[in-house]
């Protein structure tokens, strides 16, 4: 195998805007700032909400309503 062809891995810190600090190994040589992480993302925190704009979901269900007979 050839030597000195692989990138160097170094330990960096990824800092989220919520204050969470994550230490990871990466090929980049500087620390990074994140806008969102698993600690503050709505999907992971359970604060996710579904927004139905103007009853569009209901209109879709009504428009494409199939009976069991039509599916067979």
Swiss-Prot record:
Organism taxonomic ancestry: Bacteria, Pseudomonadati, Pseudomonadota, Gammaproteobacteria, Enterobacterales
Function: Binds the 23S rRNA.
Subunit structure and binding partners: Part of the 50S ribosomal subunit.
InterPro entries given in the database record: Ribosomal_bL28/bL31-like_sf, Ribosomal_bL31, Ribosomal_bL31_A, Ribosomal_bL31_sf
Keyword rRNA-binding: yes
Cofactor note: Binds 1 zinc ion per subunit.
Similarity field: Belongs to the bacterial ribosomal protein bL31 family. Type A subfamily.
UniProt xrefs under HAMAP family: Ribosomal_bL31_1 (MF_00501)
KW Calcium (keyword) present: no
GO biological process, one term: translation
Protein name per its UniProtKB record: Large ribosomal subunit protein bL31
Binding positions for Zn(2+) per the UniProt entry: 16, 18, 37, 40
Molecular-function GO terms, alphabetical: metal ion binding; rRNA binding; structural constituent of ribosome
Keywords (A to Z) from UniProt: Metal-binding, Ribonucleoprotein, Ribosomal protein, RNA-binding, rRNA-binding, Zinc
SUPFAM superfamilies found in the cross-reference section: L28p-like
Coiled coil: none
């Amino acid at each position: 195998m050839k030597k000195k062809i692989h990138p160097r891995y170094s330990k960096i810190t990824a800092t989220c805007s919520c204050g969470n600090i994550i230490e990871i190994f990466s090929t980049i040589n500087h620390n990074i700032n994140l806008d969102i992480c698993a600690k503050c993302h709505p999907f992971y925190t359970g604060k996710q909400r579904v927004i139905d704009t103007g009853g569009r979901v209901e209109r879709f269900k009504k428009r494409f309503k199939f009976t069991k007979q039509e599916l067979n």
